[in-house]
């Protein structure tokens, strides 16, 4: 890519470390520009626009071809799916249809997640539609889910060193569980980027 844009003075390619969650909007802006955003700011507040490749392609199709966003590429994967693969589907296609197109469930599926393993959310109804923000369907068996069950916090501090927002997740989790909203806000809970790093220490 650097070679392709070498004669374009307005474009610079910046190589970053492969590091999660560096692709998150605030983390990416900081890594590329060293500008900091808080939860009340938009990228435009620090002179940035952040788009992923899918969005850039959608903009091109809309401007050049007059095509609205009616399709998405969705990955169906996990140890609980028979034939993991990528699909280009119309928005509105149900999760159930995609699971069936990928050969259905394999084994004893315990959890189906919309999105990835770190920032995705559990699905309880598979007859919901694919929307513009859908990216993946992750199907996990009982064995995988059991290996990642929640355990009691021992205050080891590893979640603190792993937090890209420089928060104290163990304290924030306690405040959230106890419904202590004022303390949650006081200790910058709203700055959490919901990357899930603290869940995997």
Model-predicted regions and their roles:
Residues 1-95, 101-108, 116:
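Hydrophobic alpha-helical positions that pack around
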Residues 14-16, 77-79, 90, 113-115, ...:
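Generic beta-strand/beta-sheet core signal
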Residues 17-21, 118, 142-143, 178:
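Short, solvent-exposed coil/turn elements at secondary-structure transition points
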Residues 28-33, 103-157:
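Active-site gating/interface segments in enzymes
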Residues 92, 97-99, 112, 163, ...:
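Short alpha-helical segments in extracytoplasmic peptidoglycan/chitin-binding modules
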């Amino acid at each position: 890519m650097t070679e392709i844009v070498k004669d374009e003075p307005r474009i610079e390619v910046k190589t970053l470390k492969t590091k999660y969650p560096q692709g998150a909007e605030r983390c990416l802006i900081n890594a590329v520009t060293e500008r900091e955003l808080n939860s009340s700011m938009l990228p435009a507040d620090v002179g940035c626009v952040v788009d992923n490749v899918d969005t850039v392609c959608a903009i091109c199709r809309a401007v050049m071809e007059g095509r609205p966003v009616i399709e998405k590429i969705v990955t169906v994967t996990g140890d609980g799916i028979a034939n993991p693969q990528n699909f280009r589907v119309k928005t509105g296609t149900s999760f159930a249809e995609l699971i069936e197109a990928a050969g259905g469930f394999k084994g004893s599926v315990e959890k189906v997640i919309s999105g990835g393993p770190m920032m995705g959310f559990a699905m309880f109804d598979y007859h919901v539609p694919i929307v513009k923000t859908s990216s993946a369907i992750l199907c996990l068996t009982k064995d995988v889910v059991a290996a990642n069950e929640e355990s009691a916090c021992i205050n080891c501090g590893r979640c603190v060193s792993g937090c890209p927002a420089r928060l104290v997740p163990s304290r924030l989790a306690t405040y959230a569980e106890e419904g202590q909203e004022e303390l949650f806000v006081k200790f910058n809970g709203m700055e959490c980027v919901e990357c899930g790093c603290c869940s995997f220490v």
